[in-house]
Amino acid sequence: MADTIWYTRCPVPTASGIAFQRDMFADEFDGSDYDVRNIKELGKEKADSHFNHALDNCFREGGSIPPLWAKQGGADTVMVGLTFLSDAICFYVRPDSDIKTMQDLKSKRVAVGVRPYIMIDFMKINGHKAWDCGLRAHGMTLDDVELVEVEINDDMHSHINPDPKTGEKPPGTLMFQNELDALNRGDVDAIWVKGCQTRQMERELSGEIRLISDLLYDTDNPELKVNANPRIITVSGNIARDNPDAVVRYLQVLIRAARWSADQPRDSAQILATELGVSLSDINGAFVENYQNKLWPNLSAETMHLLSTQQDFMLAHDYLPGEVDLASWCDDSFLRKAYERENLTWAA
């Protein structure tokens, strides 16, 4: 009987999502000692493993905040890859607002959604960092605005690993609905939204919100585009130690998915739009140009540096009680071997 490799992914563009939608894991591991399955099959009682990485034999690809938090807390994980894909980070006001630019936010109230029920409130950190970067990109700081917490009681666990094949849909603009409601009530003067939800919201709420800045276009500084990215590929320590070949084979699948995405950009865009629960036009306008060619796993010095800026922010604002040694957490031997087996140049 085959052992199970569990995987989990965030609702963002990932090679894991493409591989899952195209049955590439099944193709690679068919007839092997492993069966690759979605942690969603384990039910809600195991859903937190997406955040704390407490499940053995598990791979995760997604936002950087939970893996950093879990590792600092003692999770037995290995970082085996990174990707960096800039996405829209947008700031909106009401259409009748006298706020025209980011500089007009001086002394204004800006929304940060908070979810007290979740073990690591990554969206609060995302919001805090989005405002930090958005203001810095326009010569301001967090001291220039009032951060207003908007409490949210949704179910983030339901957003983990949606399976479009079964009709499940990712959260879409619902992830920012509470902040939007606060804006419309007048509780805050501005909100932030990221990723393909920006274009979806602009399309669905045309005339009801007004964009004042988008960091995808308003800054060339990659450090100011870091918001839950670089995405991290982590694996449970037990499988890295006990069956390194399985880790290499898993990464080979991600490399193949990244190559397919680069070679078939139109098909890739459609798969990712389905994966994220948005239209094709939404996804094509929400990410850096040629985003379909940005899913290659790597551990380059540049991407590692960008990850360090995410950690620095978390440390500075007490979201991490201590520093993760990124160099010792990272093991590039698996990814090097995977590229070698695929006869491709190591993407360092």
For each feature predicted by the language model, list its residue ranges.
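Short, glycine-/small- and polar/acidic-enriched structural segments
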Residues: 3-158
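Short glycine-centered helix-capping/turn motifs at secondary-structure transition points
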Residues: 18, 22-23, 186, 294, ...
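Short, solvent-exposed loop/beta-turn-alpha elements that line the ligand-binding surface or hinge
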Residues: 26-30, 217-223, 294-302
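Pocket-lining segment of extracytoplasmic ligand-binding domains
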Residues: 65, 156-159, 163-271
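Secondary-structure end/capping motifs
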Residues: 241-319
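Conserved C-terminal helix/tail region of periplasmic/extracytoplasmic solute-binding proteins
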Residues: 312-348
